[in-house]
Amino acid sequence: TQIKEVAEAVEQLFHVLIRQSERYKNVLMPGYTHLQIAMPSSFGLWFGAYAESLMDDMLFLQAAFKMCNRNPLGSAAGYGSSFPLNRTMTTDLLGFDSMNYNVVYAQMGRGKMERNVAFALATIAGTISKLAFDACMFNSQNFGFVKLPDDCTTGSSIMPHKKNPDVFELTRAKCNKLQSLPQQIMMIANNLPSGYFRDLQIIKEVFLPAFQELKD
């Protein structure tokens, strides 16, 4: 459910970017390399680039969903159950697309599954972080291409003439934090042999909140 909710949120952002791409396709802006003006471009191209980036990000999310949408029921502590379970039936009843056929792998795959999902979340966060950076930069007096609304900016306690892009700066920081998630999970599960270990419990602390953080 969490993965699907993220996918729906990404799809909504994608459609916003596509609409803006069409709306501003004839509005010129400089194209930059090395932060120096290089060639003519347009805001339509800029919006469209982020829309296409999200399409690629969704491929990672779809792959991660496919890998974790497998029924582990029947693996018990990792070595099978003495109960006569019909694993095919439980897979159908629980709505899984497939099952973990090897009971040891069903348990041993913990950490790997979370890392795959975390990598997909991190790629989405990377796209949004870059978008937020551009918004901050283009809003500055040195560029002045966009004017952020008042509810996305704050003033300064000692410099009242300023409009600081706090919302986009916080978005950038939170997305950069999310990009560290795969590494955190990898290091928690690093050097663990097969079998269950309490180390895996710590993954939940960093993994589960990430969905809401990205949706926010």
Language-model segments: which ranges?
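Internal glycine-rich alpha/beta core junctions
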Residues: 40-191, 208, 212
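Long, non-coiled-coil amphipathic alpha-helical linker/lever segments
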Residues: 1-39, 98-113, 192-200
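C-terminal catalytic subdomain
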Residues: 178, 197-216
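Short, charged, low-complexity loops and linkers
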Residues: 1-6, 158-168, 197-205
